[in-house]
Curated annotation (Swiss-Prot):
The chain crosses the membrane at residues 3-23, 77-97, 104-124, 143-163. It is an enzyme of class 7 (translocase). GO terms for cellular component: mitochondrial inner membrane. It comes from Drosophila affinis. InterPro entries: NADH_UbQ_OxRdtase_su1/FPO, NADH_UbQ_OxRdtase_su1_CS. The lineage of its organism: Eukaryota, Metazoa, Ecdysozoa, Arthropoda, Hexapoda. This is NADH-ubiquinone oxidoreductase chain 1. Its EC number is 7.1.1.2. It is found in: Mitochondrion inner membrane. One of its GO terms (biological process) is aerobic respiration. Keywords: Electron transport, Membrane, Mitochondrion, Mitochondrion inner membrane, NAD, Respiratory chain, Translocase, Transmembrane, Transmembrane helix, Transport, Ubiquinone.
Length: 163
């Protein structure tokens, strides 16, 4: 019974995160529209509120294309794996209802964030294009350098909170 409750809680958390990201994207588009002295997305429904759902339907109905010489399976699995890794990060966040209790939640956060680097590298490699591979390696180098500074800042905060 406890497993089912944690599974339902996890699914509810994932759905809430995805819907909130969709509406934050709508907010960003509205703000950018008002900055550029236009209304932003307002054609769908009342003031464009259902726009993220229409964008999702449009995205899922588009034709799937892939490079001819690419590794088909890893080309499509790496972005899906990256999405799952970013959703796993939300599992260690402390909420009012404890879904999972981690003693080392910060370490789990850093591990999930550092595993996302490999998905970018695999996505660049699996297209079998030298330019995509170089772009993926450049993104990996940038991400690793940002992760080092993020870890140092986190350890500094942890050190000062213990003093």
């Amino acid at each position: 019974m406890e497993f089912i409750l944690s599974l339902v809680g996890s699914l509810l958390l994932i759905i809430c995160v995805l819907v909130s990201v969709a509406f934050l994207t709508l907010l960003e588009r509205k703000v950018l529209g008002y900055i550029q002295i236009r209304k932003g997305p307002n054609k769908v429904g009342l003031m464009g509120i259902p726009q993220p759902f229409c964008d999702a339907i449009k995205l899922f109905t588009k034709e799937q294309t892939y490079p001819l010489l690419s590794n088909y399976l890893s080309y499509y699995i790496s972005p899906i794996f990256s999405l799952f890794l970013s959703l796993f990060v939300w599992m260690c966040m402390p909420f009012f209802v404890k879904l999972y209790s981690f003693n080392l939640g910060g370490l789990f956060f850093l591990c999930c964030m550092s595993l996302g680097v490999y998905t970018v590298m695999v996505a660049g490699w699996s297209s079998n294009s030298n330019y995509a591979l170089l772009g993926g390696l450049r993104a990996v180098a940038q991400t690793i350098s940002y992760e080092v500074s993020l870890a140092l800042i986190g350890f500094k905060i942890l050190l000062f909170s213990l003093l």
